[in-house]
Amino acid sequence: MSMTDNVADMLTRIRNAYKSKLINVSFPSSKIKTSILDVLQKEGYIKDYVTTQKNNISYTEVALKYSVNGEASICEIHRVSKPGKRVYSAIKDLKGYYNNMGIYILSTPYGVMSDREAHIKNVGGEVICKVF
């Protein structure tokens, strides 16, 4: 069975790892996944990530972030734009997710960025996912 949505697979692995209270999670690497992880790290949702090679296949290992109480830094992470139904949005149409406590991750002409950064640059794009 082939995988049609690699980004959704990554988000599901991260969500399941947080539910299982795992420290690390790994999955096959790609440029778009690395860009999304850059945004998650910049916004403080994950600790760090490392890309490694195993048998000529690159894998990304993500160090998940928990609070002092052991609560996950990500409560919800969902795919918005899917291969069968792409979702595009102008920046003026994106309201703050969970009263500005969460973020949207966008793919714009200037690269992958959070909705906060997109507001500063005044640019819209494809809404990849939402994180809270």
UniProtKB/Swiss-Prot annotation:
Pfam families attached to this UniProt entry: Ribosomal_S8
GO biological process: translation
Disulfide bonds: none
InterPro entries: Ribosomal_uS8, Ribosomal_uS8_CS, Ribosomal_uS8_sf
One of the record's GO cellular component terms: ribosome
An example molecular function term from Gene Ontology annotations: rRNA binding
Domain of life: Bacteria
Keyword set, alphabetical order: Ribonucleoprotein, Ribosomal protein, RNA-binding, rRNA-binding
Subunit field text: Part of the 30S ribosomal subunit. Contacts proteins S5 and S12.
Family: Belongs to the universal ribosomal protein uS8 family.
Role noted for this protein: One of the primary rRNA binding proteins, it binds directly to 16S rRNA central domain where it helps coordinate assembly of the platform of the 30S subunit.
Stated name of the protein: Small ribosomal subunit protein uS8
Organism: Rickettsia prowazekii (strain Madrid E)
